[in-house]
Each structure stands twice: as C-alpha cells, then as structure tokens.
Regions:
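Terminal amphipathic helices with adjacent charged low-complexity linkers/tails
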Residues: 127-182
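Glycine-rich phosphate/ribose-binding loops and adjacent secondary-structure elements
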Residues: 1-98, 215, 219-220, 225-227
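Alpha-helix initiation and N-capping motif
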Residues: 81, 115, 127-131, 152-155, ...
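Non-catalytic terminal/interface segments that mediate subunit docking, oligomerization
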Residues: 1-28, 163-227
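Mobile "lid/hinge" segments at catalytic clefts and subdomain interfaces of large enzymes
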Residues: 57-60, 64-147
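Hydrophobic alpha-helical scaffolding
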Residues: 9-16, 43, 74-77, 97-112, ...
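Acidic-enriched, low-complexity/disordered segments with a strong bias for Aspartate over Glutamate
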Residues: 41, 49, 59, 117, ...
Length: 227
C-alpha cells in the first residue's frame, strides 16, 4: 500500500506470477481447483497483465493503485497521516474540498480501455471469453529479446499445471455460502423492500463481533436488484 515502507514495497512478498502458478498447480494436483476461486492482484495495469494472470489460473482480479491514481492519487505515501495533498486518502473536509479533483468518469474510462485491451488479446488468441483461457499456461511463450542472464531462468514450472491430466483448471462448483446471522437476515427482510421501493431506512441495532459482515447480504441483494 501507499503507507508501506519503501523496503517492503520493493522487496517484501513474492511476485504474484510465481505464487499464482504454485496455487493453481497445488489445487489441481489435489482435485480441489473446481471448488476454489483464485483472485490475484498487485501491479495489474494493462489488459496483457489480465491475460497473463488468466493463463496462470486466475478467476478474478483486483485493482487498487491504478484506479486510485485515476482519481488523482500521486502516491505520496502519507495515507496514514490524514494529510493527503490530493484529498484522496483523507477524512479532513478542508483537504477534500480544496484538493480532491477526482471524477468517477476517469475510473470508468480506465476500466473501459482495460476491457478493450483484454478483448484485443482475446481475439488474437482466438478465445471468446476469459473463461476459455483460465489455466491455459501452455499458451505462454518465453520472450527471447531479454538480456542473457534472464534467459538462464528456468520458467518451466510456471506451465506445470497445464500438463496435469483430467484435473479441472478453474472453478466449476458453486461457492459455499454461509447462512447469514439472524440479525443480518432481519435487516435484509426489513430494509430491502423499503429500499427497493425507493424509501430511506434507518435502523439502530446492537451488534457484536458475530455480526462483522452486517449489511453485506443487503448490499448483495441491492446489487442483484439494481446492478
């Protein structure tokens, strides 16, 4: 994140390509891949990044930094101080009023161009959708226009999962959904009809740690109803 030490940003963790390929191979070897949705994030920027992640086994993708930059983030790494100079990562009304210039249309434009880029790569590969390419690591080709030292790297393990016979390469089984808590179900039953009818709803309830996801079910129902 923007508040991480620079040493952590540069050196901590592993490239998502390596861990994604490893997770894909392990799940397929154990016959569990069809039960799991694999999501990857961290440095995804272009349609080609999405295609590569798909070929390595990703079902979905997370974007954080680039949409924030589309809203005006300058990556000043002071998010935790509540003094963001662009008004993006602050709750200070004065800073937001004076400096925040972000528009949702900019984020929409970014993802629109991203999707168009993905579509061009899909057409070049002769695929109709990303689902056709999930786990198709055999389609990855190593570049030859790289320095000699990089040519010495053995990247064959990145493609190992594609050669496993008979194992599912992406999620096929429906997700396992935990039943909502009684309070969450009560909120859904009481608030959803009112919100669907265009009326505002106000409720005061006592919650504890068992209701950490309170409101998620209602948000999902609204998303299904209104998109």
């Amino acid at each position: 994140t923007g508040v991480s030490p620079i040493s952590s940003i540069r050196y901590a963790g592993s490239p998502w390509e390596l861990r994604l390929a490893e997770a894909q191979e392990t799940l397929r070897r154990n016959g569990l891949r069809e039960r799991v949705r694999l999501q990857t994030d961290g440095g995804l920027k272009t349609g080609l990044d999405v295609i590569k992640a798909t070929l390595l086994g990703a079902d979905s993708f997370g974007f954080g930094t680039v949409p924030m930059m589309a809203l005006g983030c300058k990556y000043l790494r002071i998010c935790h101080l509540n003094t963001c100079a662009t008004g993006v990562a602050t709750q200070e009304p004065r800073l937001r009023a004076q400096h925040f210039k972000g528009l949702p249309e900019r984020v929409i434009a970014y993802f629109t161009y991203l999707v168009e880029d993905v579509r061009r790569h899909l057409a070049a590969l002769g695929a109709r959708s990303l689902e056709d390419l999930i786990g198709r690591a055999d389609l990855l080709v190593e570049r030859e226009d790289v320095p000699h030292r990089q040519q010495l790297l053995d990247l064959s393990r990145l493609k190992a999962s594609a050669s496993l016979p008979g194992a599912a390469s992406h999620r096929a089984a429906p997700p396992i959904a935990a039943p909502p808590s009684p309070l969450a179900q009560q909120l859904l039953d009481e608030a959803f009809p009112e919100l669907k009818a265009g009326r505002s709803v106000r409720r005061e309830v006592r919650i504890d740690t068992q209701d950490r996801s309170l409101g998620a079910g209602l948000a999902g129902a609204l998303a299904k109803a209104f998109g």
